C-alpha cells in the first residue's frame, strides 16, 4: 500500500492502523531551530480524541503523543528544539475491541471502504477499518501542530457550521464559543439545537453529516504557485483526503456561481498602514493559486458515519447477499472531531507552501 505521504518540503508520512499497537507520523523537512513542547501537540490531540462526550464514539483513547526523534530536549526537560532531521511521533492504541468486528470479517459494510480495499489488495483489515479508519487522523493532528510552528504568526482555527439540516447563525459567530461546547460551534445559540437533534439521531442508531469551516490568518501574501502548484489546490486535496469528506470549497466556493462579477470580485484600496487592503474576501484569501494575505477560508462536507445500527443490504466476500448491522463504538456525527483534523491539514498545506516559496524566492 503506497500513498501514505503528503507534502513536498514539509512532508508527512503517517503509519498504523485502528486496532494495531500504535500509530504515528514522520515529519520530514521541518526547519531546524523551532521550539515546542509535547504539551502543545497534546492540546490539539485532546480536541480530536474520542470519548469526550456522548456525541462522539465511546472508545476511550488517551492519545498521548511521544516524540521519538528529530529534536533536542532543553535543560528544562520540557522544551524541544527541532534539529532538521525527521521528527517521528507515536500514539499508542489502548482501547481496541476487535471482537466487535468478528461478524463483518467477510461482509462489506455499505458506505465503508471494505469492498474497495478488498477489490484492490485482495485483503483488508476488518478490525475497525484498519488503515481506512479515522483513527489514522490522530497522526495528522500531531503533524499539524508542528506545521503551525513553521510559519511565523500563523493562526488556524476551525468550527462546525452545519449539522445535517441545521446550520449556525453567522451573525452570532464568536470564536471564543468554539471550545465551550462539544460541537465546536461558534454560535452559542445553535448548541441546544445541535444537541437535541443529535440526541435523536444517536438514540435511533443512525448518523448525520456536517460542514466544517477552517480559517487561517497570518498567511503571507505570495505563497502558493500558479497552474499545477496552487495553494488552494493543495488545501482541497488534503481536506479531501480526510475520512468521510465528500466536498471542499474555498472562499465563496459554489456560492460564487450564483453571483455577478460585481458581487464576487474583491475590490482593493490602500489601507491606513500603506499596504494593500481587500474590501471583501470572496476569494477566500487565494487568487491564481497564490495567497493574497487575506484570511484563507475553506469549508468541507463530511458525510454521515456509515457505521449505523440499522440493517443495510450488502454482500459478503463469497458473493452472497447479506444484511449488515454494524456493532462497535462509532461517532453519530464524525464531523465534530473533523474540526481539529481540518485545521491540521490546512496548517500542513500552508507550511509546505511557505517553505517552497522561501526556497524559490528567498523571501517570505
Curated annotation (Swiss-Prot):
- Annotated InterPro entries: Chorismate_synth (IPR000453), Chorismate_synth_AroC_sf (IPR035904), Chorismate_synthase_CS (IPR020541)
One protein family per Pfam: Chorismate_synt
Q: Which cofactors, by name?
A: FMNH2
Q: What class of enzyme is it?
A: lyase
Q: In which pathway does it act?
A: Metabolic intermediate biosynthesis; chorismate biosynthesis; chorismate from D-erythrose 4-phosphate and phosphoenolpyruvate: step 7/7
User: According to its UniProt record, which reaction does this protein catalyse?
Assistant: 5-O-(1-carboxyvinyl)-3-phosphoshikimate = chorismate + phosphate
Keyword field: Amino-acid biosynthesis, Aromatic amino acid biosynthesis, FAD, Flavoprotein, FMN, Lyase, NADP
Residues annotated as binding NADP(+) are 48
Provide the E.C. number(s) assigned to this enzyme.
4.2.3.5
Q: How is the cofactor bound?
A: Reduced FMN (FMNH(2)).
Q: Which one GO biological process term can you cite for this protein?
A: amino acid biosynthetic process
What one GO molecular function would you report for this record?
FMN binding
Can you tell me which residues bind FMN?
131-133, 243-244, 288, 303-307, 329
Q: Which GO terms describe its cellular component?
A: cytosol
Q: Which family does it belong to?
A: Belongs to the chorismate synthase family.
PANTHER family for the chain? CHORISMATE SYNTHASE
Subunit-structure text:
Homotetramer.
| Its job | This reaction introduces a second double bond into the aromatic ring system.
Q: Per its UniProt record, what NCBIfam families does this chain match?
A: aroC, PRK05382.1
Q: List the HAMAP family hit by this protein, alphabetically.
A: Chorismate_synth
Q: What is this protein called?
A: Chorismate synthase
Source organism of the structure? Brucella anthropi (strain ATCC 49188 / DSM 6882 / CCUG 24695 / JCM 21032 / LMG 3331 / NBRC 15819 / NCTC 12168 / Alc 37) (Ochrobactrum anthropi)
Its taxonomic path starts at: Bacteria, Pseudomonadati, Pseudomonadota, Alphaproteobacteria, Hyphomicrobiales
Amino acid at each position: 500500500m503506497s500513498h501514505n505521504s503528503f507534502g513536498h518540503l514539509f512532508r508527512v508520512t503517517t503509519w498504523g492502523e485502528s486496532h494495531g499497537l500504535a500509530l504515528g507520523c514522520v515529519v520530514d523537512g521541518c526547519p531546524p531551530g523551532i521550539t515546542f513542547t509535547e504539551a502543545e501537540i497534546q492540546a490539539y490531540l485532546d480536541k480530536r480524541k474520542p470519548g469526550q462526550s456522548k456525541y462522539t464514539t465511546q472508545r476511550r483513547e488517551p492519545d498521548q503523543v511521544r516524540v521519538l526523534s528529530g529534536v533536542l530536549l532543553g535543560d528544562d526537560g520540557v522544551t524541544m528544539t527541532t534539529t532538521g532531521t525527521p521528527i517521528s511521533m507515536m500514539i499508542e492504541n489502548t482501547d481496541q475491541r476487535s471482537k466487535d468486528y468478528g461478524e463483518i470479517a467477510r461482509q462489506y459494510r455499505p458506505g465503508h471502504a471494505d469492498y474497495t480495499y478488498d477489490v484492490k489488495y485482495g485483503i483488508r483489515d476488518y478490525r475497525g477499518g484498519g488503515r481506512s479508519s479515522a483513527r489514522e487522523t490522530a497522526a495528522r493532528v500531531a503533524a499539524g501542530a508542528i506545521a503551525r510552528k513553521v510559519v511565523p504568526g500563523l493562526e488556524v482555527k476551525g468550527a462546525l457550521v452545519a449539522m445535517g439540516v441545521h446550520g449556525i447563525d453567522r451573525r452570532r459567530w464568536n470564536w471564543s464559543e468554539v471550545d465551550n461546547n462539544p460541537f465546536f460551534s461558534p454560535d452559542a445559540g445553535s448548541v441546544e439545537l445541535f444537541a437535541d437533534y443529535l440526541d435523536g439521531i444517536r438514540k435511533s442508531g443512525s448518523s448525520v453529516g456536517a460542514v466544517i469551516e477552517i480559517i487561517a490568518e497570518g498567511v503571507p501574501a505570495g505563497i502558493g504557485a500558479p497552474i499545477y502548484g496552487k495553494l488552494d489546490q493543495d488545501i482541497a486535496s488534503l481536506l479531501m483526503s480526510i475520512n468521510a469528506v465528500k466536498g471542499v470549497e474555498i472562499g465563496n466556493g459554489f456560492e460564487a456561481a450564483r453571483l455577478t462579477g460585481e458581487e464576487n470580485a474583491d475590490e482593493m484600496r490602500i489601507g491606513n498602514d500603506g499596504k494593500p487592503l481587500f474590501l471583501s474576501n470572496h476569494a477566500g484569501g487565494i487568487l491564481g493559486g497564490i495567497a493574497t494575505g487575506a484570511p484563507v477560508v475553506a469549508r468541507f462536507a463530511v458525510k454521515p458515519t456509515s457505521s449505523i445500527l440499522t440493517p443495510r443490504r450488502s454482500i459478503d466476500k463469497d458473493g452472497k447477499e447479506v444484511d449488515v448491522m454494524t456493532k462497535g463504538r462509532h461517532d453519530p456525527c464524525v464531523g465534530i472531531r473533523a474540526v481539529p483534523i481540518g485545521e491540521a491539514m490546512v496548517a500542513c498545506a500552508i507550511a509546505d507552501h511557505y517553505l517552497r516559496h522561501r526556497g524559490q524566492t528567498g523571501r517570505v
